[in-house]
Amino acid sequence: MAIELFYDADADLSIIQGRKVAIIGYGSQGHAHAQNLRDSGVEVVIGLREGSKSAEKAKEAGFEVKTTAEAAAWANLIMILAPDTSQASIFTNDVEPNLNEGDALFFGHGLNIHFDLIKPADNIIVGMVAPKGPGHLVRRQFVDGKGVPCLIAIDQDPTGDAQALALSYASAIGGGRAGIIPTTFEAETVTDLFGEQAVLCGGTEELVKTGFEVLTEAGYEPEMAYFEVLHELKLIVDLMFEGGITNMNYSVSDTAEFGGYLSGPRVINADTKERMKDILTDIQDGTFTKRLIANVENGNTELEGLRAKYAEHPIEETGAKLRDLMSWVKNPLTETA
């Protein structure tokens, strides 16, 4: 089924310009949303917890900074762009007491709404606007007169004009210049989590580490293994990003292409696909989210333990040494980004 696309011509910018918008959080997405909205003629304040390190950055960018509760009380559209694991407490303590009938509560990711961690009153508009790119790209494209495609979704529409509001917001941050794609909270949440866990973060990390282990255990130098299974990964991903898998296969050598066709299915096979389906089920039925929340409630002990364990893998020490030889590569372990 073909997706439906909307553009600036389909959006009424005056709708969002008639709202007072509080951006909760001033990280990667927060700064881009706030600046793009302001440049589109929208009145914006930033809501942050007291003592937030982001407050000074927001003030330097010319924004009024309020506490989260003050920002929520001032606004009639609240966009929550804080980390997933902080959103429920932010909503309960600071946002919910300051919501009024007809206010809008927007999110950049659907997890908390889809899994009922946040349950706004029925008279509140609940929507999502999610650019498909990091905040710095959303901002840079906007400044250049372009945009990043945006997903929009509606969970509650007590007034009947929630989609028009979401379209207006997405257009104001540049989404309408590239394409605005309607979806659902469920689809955005599940596909996003699955992509992160099975492919982008979890799957890729394990593939790289296992390849490194196979080569080093066979007696090859760790440096050679690092170059072949991690360093060159960016070259391949960039080719896929720019033109798809066919573009990547066209661009590499015949030897690499032929070997990939033969050996790829030996690594990622029918058994792998079944395990990926298990991961999808854990996401769909809430198993993963329950574990995520339990980790937070236990002081992040599971996450911290996993983080420490994974950081000890030999590929990390090898990579840090090699990246120090590459003046064009930023190494966040030794440099301030």
Swiss-Prot record:
Keywords: Amino-acid biosynthesis, Branched-chain amino acid biosynthesis, Magnesium, Metal-binding, NADP, Oxidoreductase
Cofactor: Mg(2+)
Top-level division of the source organism's lineage: Bacteria
Domain KARI N-terminal Rossmann: 3-183
Any one GO molecular function term: NADP binding
Major enzyme class: oxidoreductase
Family of this protein: Belongs to the ketol-acid reductoisomerase family.
Protein name: Ketol-acid reductoisomerase (NADP(+))
Organism: Corynebacterium efficiens (strain DSM 44549 / YS-314 / AJ 12310 / JCM 11189 / NBRC 100395)
Gene that encodes the chain: ilvC
